[in-house]
Amino acid sequence: MIENLRNIAIIAHVDHGKTTLVDKLLQQSGTFDARAETQERVMDSNDLEKERGITILAKNTAIKWNDYRINIVDTPGHADFGGEVERVMSMVDSVLLVVDAFDGPMPQTRFVTKKAFAHGLKPIVVINKVDRPGARPDWVVDQVFDLFVNLDATDEQLDFPIIYASALNGIAGLDHEDMAEDMTPLYQAIVDHVPAPDVDLDGPLQMQISQLDYNNYVGVIGIGRIKRGKVKPNQQVTIIDSEGKTRNAKVGKVLTHLGLERIDSNIAEAGDIIAITGLGELNISDTICDPQNVEALPALSVDEPTVSMFFCVNTSPFCGKEGKFVTSRQILDRLNKELVHNVALRVEETEDADAFRVSGRGELHLSVLIENMRREGFELAVSRPKVIFREIDGRKQEPYENVTLDVEEQHQGSVMQALGERKGDLKNMNPDGKGRVRLDYVIPSRGLIGFRSEFMTMTSGTGLLYSTFSHYDDIRPGEVGQRQNGVLISNGQGKAVAFALFGLQDRGKLFLGHGAEVYEGQIIGIHSRSNDLTVNCLTGKKLTNMRASGTDEAVILVPPIKMSLEQALEFIDDDELVEVTPTSIRIRKRHLTENDRRRANRGQKEE
């Protein structure tokens, strides 16, 4: 029944608990059988999402509550996955904004909420984690209201219902002093405040594909919301792509969501979010319609990429030892496969057959792709992320980001100085009276590349940093965020030995310990000065029959610095690459031998 259908998207900042909230909604509605084993954080389906605690792909689930059926779409919180967010908004009639009762709305919440308002959706606000120490729900409600006013919300959008919840304990209420035993107030609010889909049941079929899934058994699965009409298995349809080309196809199965599973359905009606198989190669934004009434829905717009980097074939001496897929053809095939469902990604071939230029919405967007490829057994070398400049009205412009930092007062000075050097403008400063300060900045994207790891060191790991893309504006002159220190480069291939590493410790910090395999041109540490230094880490202690009268000195090594993929990408300079294999992340110079490096430097100077 169409009157009993509700479509809703969940918006939240990373770590404000939306995925846990969906868990509880599913469990308490009785959608899961009493016998079914329930996983924690059911919505984060791939390993990477579970490890990082972030949602990357938008996902769908459906809940039966009393006689109502509620379709819930989980949206990614990061602006880097803006391409995903854009499409979700076209499928739903309202949004559930989940905000932490202590943190309040964050810049990434702002990004997604802005998109929702642009689509004319009305919000329901859920203040989550009201049981956490230091929770200040009333302050958060004021902050949310201010945010909505800043985003030019209409009067209807500003008249939003507020539900207080503690998703972990599975309780909700209309007042944070007086909570119900379970989530009923939230279900009730969804049913009361979300409009039923406004669609035409009797017209000819029309639906738009807003997500794609793939399954080896049935091939490409298109997911979307039926705009009007009905669809049955084995029905003949016409598909229109974004360029207006049409082709005919026959629907395989029609699947509706229930809980986390997809269930075969004999018929699906307008307003429902369904998955459909058997239509061959589909693309996002394709319209599926009745062959007698071929009309396309407006194409979904996606934000343009702002950061690009080169993916190259791994040319190091250890190439092919750890990974299964190493050739340029395999890398290109994998990137093209990613393009099918990762809409905000761009891949271009370059003059060099072994390098591809990959552009995305931000460092996180690209590093998630690299991490996924690495887990699948790929080996590749990647360059430093670079910002994409645009020419607008004859003027060269660069992307700017809104950054929110939350730091302890003692670190405030050094953080503000560092952001000043990186050409950031302070927009707002808000001390919370308990020793922490929230700073709001607008900063060029290139000023942020490499800043996160420096920021973590500066605040001894206590600082929080969130950023989202803001706008394009004129370029600020001068270089930003150059690395201050040089690096230590290995001069040969073999096993690093403790005796040699011990002698190098005075020169800087090392990336590897005793027994690690190294090759010529690999970066093995950070130099304590600003120049690069080629060093020998392979020489063991010579054995002679002469011994000092005392005992030998004990060789004690400081534990090496282990870098994650993001840290390595932020650390490198333009003449360096990160070598990524399934088991290790190494950093190397683009030119491996010292002679090649000198020649390259000479060439640059002559230019």
From Swiss-Prot:
It comes from Salmonella typhimurium (strain LT2 / SGSC1412 / ATCC 700720). Changing residue 507 to A: Still binds to 70S ribosomes in presence of GMPPNP. This is Large ribosomal subunit assembly factor BipA. It catalyses: GTP + H2O = GDP + phosphate + H(+). The gene is bipA. Its main location: cytoplasm. Changing residue 18 to A: No longer binds to 70S ribosomes, has no GTPase activity. Induction: Induced 7-fold when cells are treated with human bactericidal permeability-increasing protein (BPI, AC P17213) (at protein level). Has 5 domains; domain I (residues 1-202, also called the G domain), II (203-305, also called the beta barrel domain), III (306-386) V (387-479) and the C-terminal domain (CTD 480-607) which is BipA-specific. Domains I-V are homologous to domains in EF-G and LepA; although the domains are similar, their relative arrangement among these proteins is different. Domains I and II are not required for ribosome binding, although in their absence no 30S binding under stress is seen, whereas domains III, V and the CTD are required to bind both 70S and 30S ribosomes. Keywords: Cytoplasm, GTP-binding, Hydrolase, Nucleotide-binding, Ribosome biogenesis, RNA-binding, rRNA-binding, tRNA-binding. GO terms for cellular component: cytosol; ribonucleoprotein complex. Monomer. Residues 481-607 are annotated as: C-terminal domain (CTD), required but not sufficient to bind 70S or 30S ribosomes. Changing residue 541 to A: No longer binds to 70S ribosomes in presence of GMPPNP. The keyword Transcription does not apply. Its EC number is 3.6.5.-. Pfam families: BipA_C, EFG_C, GTP_EFTU, GTP_EFTU_D2. PANTHER family: TR-TYPE G DOMAIN-CONTAINING PROTEIN, TRANSLATION ELONGATION FACTOR-RELATED.
